């Protein structure tokens, strides 16, 4: 009948729309991967300095980037390449106020300009638009990219890799929100990537009172927040949101915690720690630095809340996720999905254990400190984390729990190693990740770590 035919047509149409959406994503990701491969063997120049002036209007950003680059190759280059998010449109590209011809091929910008060995060039690039998240994580498998499961949870939170919204903005180097001269990924040979440590200055024009977070020392000038970095960094990030701030200085490092307004679920759980928190964090910091054999390299450390849908991946060839950046770590709102984050339950469990101690029950302050210590150790100071698998309710009724050990997205060791320096060899491009993996090791089994690191490499990369 007519009603049945109409329902059938509607169902087929919905299925086609659903399929077409994923087909478009696949086509875009394939296009961007092909563009990386197309220009992979062309000599790249080094980014020396970059000053970024950023503003946002609704879901669009406007940026002016002043760039200084240098040809550090031993031969002349006849073109200069930049990488920029493909949804960001270039208004003008100039040198000393004069337009310079360029070509655009998806995320690749080709500037026809010769540079002799070690010759420098300064350019201004003005661009605006939105962020295409399909450019992110082209070096992971489709299975992992489209997998929306989070451990054993039956909930699906979705996956986002960048935000440009009225109330929240989050941009990391992965989404190419500013020009870079080296690609962030190499889909053809993932381990053959180079880091480019540069001097960054970020100026964010903001007419409202939202909190702005980035690397570097912040200062206010009128309606502009300025971040100046003393250290050279492989990239910078930007977060803008309605945050509440808590801070403390530990061993000359400014530690800052930012949660969304109304999301402070933890203060009431730990009412007794204010007087002892500084000493506790000092002990944790000293112990961790002793284990790693080096000091924390920055002057501040930021923990910032993000929407739960914000997603990243730990890739063996990078050694870290986008959730962990120089000076910054991005944590899911309300600590959802993080181990040991149910603080009230953890306090009850810790108190019950203490009551069984023949020496007597623990004091409330000791219970709170042990809960925080367990959370910090499992979330921030562990290279691996245990993730439950299957269905929570099925596991609960069957009494059978299974899981696997996975690399920890929030592991801070990358701040001490991966983001602190790099080694590059054209003949042995994997040397940087090998050295960082070796340096990170403590008393654990190095053979196991190296097996994990090389897992997934192609034969050509193993033979390189």
Segments from the language model and where they lie:
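N-terminal, polar/Ser/Thr-rich
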Residues: 1-61, 158, 162, 192-194
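Short structured motifs
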Residues: 47-54, 106-111, 183-189, 214-216
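Short acidic/proline- and small/hydrophobic-mixed sequence motifs that coincide with surface turns
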Residues: 61, 75-77
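Hydrophobic core residues within well-ordered beta-strands of beta-rich domains
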Residues: 61-65, 121, 198
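Asparagine-centered strand-capping/turn motif at beta-strand->loop junctions
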Residues: 68-74
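A surface-exposed beta-strand-loop module
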Residues: 77, 87-151, 188-192, 221-223, ...
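Extended, low-hydrophobicity, Ser/Thr/Pro/Gly-biased non-transmembrane segments
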Residues: 128-241
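Juxtacatalytic substrate-recognition/specificity segment
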Residues: 202, 226, 249-461
């Amino acid at each position: 009948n007519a009603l049945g035919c109409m329902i059938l047509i509607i169902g087929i149409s919905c299925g086609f729309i659903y399929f077409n959406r994923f087909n478009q994503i696949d086509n875009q990701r394939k296009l961007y991967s092909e563009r990386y491969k197309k220009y992979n063997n062309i000599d790249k120049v080094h980014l020396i300095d970059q000053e970024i002036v950023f503003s946002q209007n609704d879901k669009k950003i406007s940026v002016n980037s002043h760039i200084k680059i240098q040809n550090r190759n031993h031969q002349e280059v006849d073109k200069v390449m930049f990488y920029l998010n493909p949804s960001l449109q270039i208004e003008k590209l100039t040198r000393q106020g004069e337009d310079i011809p360029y070509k655009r091929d998806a995320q690749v910008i080709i500037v026809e300009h010769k540079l002799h060995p070690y010759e420098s060039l300064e350019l201004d690039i003005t661009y605006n638009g939105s962020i295409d998240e399909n450019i992110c994580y082209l070096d992971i498998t489709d299975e992992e990219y489209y997998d929306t499961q989070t451990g054993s949870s039956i909930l699906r939170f979705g996956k986002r890799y960048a935000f440009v919204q009225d109330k929240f903005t989050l941009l990391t180097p992965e989404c190419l929100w500013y020009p870079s001269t080296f690609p962030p990924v190499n889909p053809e040979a993932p381990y053959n990537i180079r880091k480019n440590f540069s001097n960054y200055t970020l100026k964010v024009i903001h007419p409202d009172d939202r909190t702005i977070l980035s690397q570097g020392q912040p200062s206010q000038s009128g309606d502009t927040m300025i971040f100046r970095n003393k250290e050279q960094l492989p990239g910078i990030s930007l977060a803008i949101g309605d945050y509440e701030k808590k801070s403390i200085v530990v061993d000359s490092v400014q530690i800052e915690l930012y949660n969304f307004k109304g999301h402070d679920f933890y203060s009431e759980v730990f009412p007794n720690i204010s007087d002892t928190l500084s000493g506790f964090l000092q002990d944790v910091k000293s112990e961790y630095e002793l284990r790693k054999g080096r000091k924390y390299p920055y002057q501040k450390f930021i923990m910032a809340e993000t929407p739960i849908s914000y997603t990243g991946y730990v890739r063996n060839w990078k050694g870290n996720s986008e959730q962990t950046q120089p000076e910054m770590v991005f944590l899911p709102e309300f600590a959802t999905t993080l181990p040991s984050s149910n603080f009230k339950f953890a306090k009850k469990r810790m108190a019950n254990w203490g009551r069984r101690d023949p020496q007597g029950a623990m004091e409330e302050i000791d219970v709170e400190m042990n809960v925080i210590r367990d959370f910090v150790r499992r979330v921030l100071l562990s290279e691996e984390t245990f993730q439950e698998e299957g269905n929570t309710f099925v596991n609960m009724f069957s009494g059978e729990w299974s899981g696997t050990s996975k690399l920890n997205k929030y592991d801070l060791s990358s701040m001490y190693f991966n983001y602190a320096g790099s080694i590059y060899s054209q003949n042995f491009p994997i040397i940087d990740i090998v050295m960082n993996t070796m340096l990170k090791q403590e008393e654990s089994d190095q053979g196991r770590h190296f097996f994990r690191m090389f897992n997934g490499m192609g034969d050509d990369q193993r033979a390189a």
